[in-house]
Amino acid sequence: MQIKSLLLAAAAAPAALGAAVGTVKPFNCGTDAPSRQHIQMTKEIAEKEAAFTAAGGVSAQAAINVNVYFHVVASSTSLSGGYVTSTMINNQVSVLNTAYAPHGIQFTLKGTDYTVNSNWAVDGSELAMKKALRKGTYKDLNLYILKDLGDALGYCYFPTSVTSKSNDWYYDGCSILYNTLPGGDLTNYNLGHTSTHEVGHWFGLYHTFQGGCTGNGDYVADTPAQASASSGCPTGRDSCPSQTGLDPIHNYMDYSYDTCYEEFTAGQKTRMTSYFNQYRANASV
């Protein structure tokens, strides 16, 4: 991952420095920009969705139930070392359910494990960590709660065609900075919506500012064009004035404060369902 490689360099900074600045930082998602191959996959899915709608189809989408496994990877057994409480984890699941329930998606906590490993806790040796900890199948969500992710608050992997037990299969899931969970101490980002955002990527969603003001943007028709990520909650922001609509600052796939986040669109719901059904729903391993 190109973006993630840069973030790992920052993660190697001394722990004392991380503690000094760790409670105040801007939102930054470490998920790689979608590859050409993945964009082509998204184009094909979008075309199928559009053709279905044009033909007068009305989708009776079944509810999606996702099993979730939490892996807390800390540098010590203290909260400041990333050792989050079970209450924080339960509250995080509640936040996810509140955000996704209107779109027919439910999350069930299936297990939580704790590991103290100073290297893994700062996102070192990602593949080795995931080979040791990953649980479930490709349709199950693994969330790795880490002490430090460099400049990022989280990152995740898009759904794709994978072979069981391949490296891509193991990499799947989301890594989340520990103090973004509900009750964490990261100013403006401690209500749990970093996980909401990253899980959106796990379902195949791009950032709302993908592609800027031109082209197909995020390939979802009902998200207004957006030139760049938002910061804070800039009401009335219109970074693409020649395009219809104000910037979707309340959309979970922007970079707004947790208090500003409110919604996914109907088109994003359809996209999440399409990706899940095509690449995850029937996974047996």
From Swiss-Prot:
Q: Report residues carrying sugar chains.
A: N282
GO BP field: proteolysis
Per UniProt, what is one GO molecular function of this protein? metallopeptidase activity
Class of this enzyme: hydrolase
Q: Where in the cell is it found?
A: Secreted
Record-annotated active site: E198
InterPro entries hit by this protein: MetalloPept_cat_dom_sf, Peptidase_M43
Q: Which residues form the signal peptide?
A: 1-18
- Which cellular component terms (GO) are annotated to the entry? extracellular region
For binding Zn(2+), which residues are annotated in this chain's numbering?
A: H197, H201
Family annotation (Pfam families): Peptidase_M43 (PF05572)
Predominantly, its location class is secreted
- Disulphide bridges in this chain? C233-C260
**EC number(s) given by UniProt:** 3.4.24.-
| Biological role stated in the UniProt entry | Secreted metalloproteinase that allows assimilation of proteinaceous substrates.
So what family is this one in? Belongs to the peptidase M43B family.
What is the protein's name according to its record? Extracellular metalloprotease SMAC_06893
Q: Which organism is it from?
A: Sordaria macrospora (strain ATCC MYA-333 / DSM 997 / K(L3346) / K-hell)
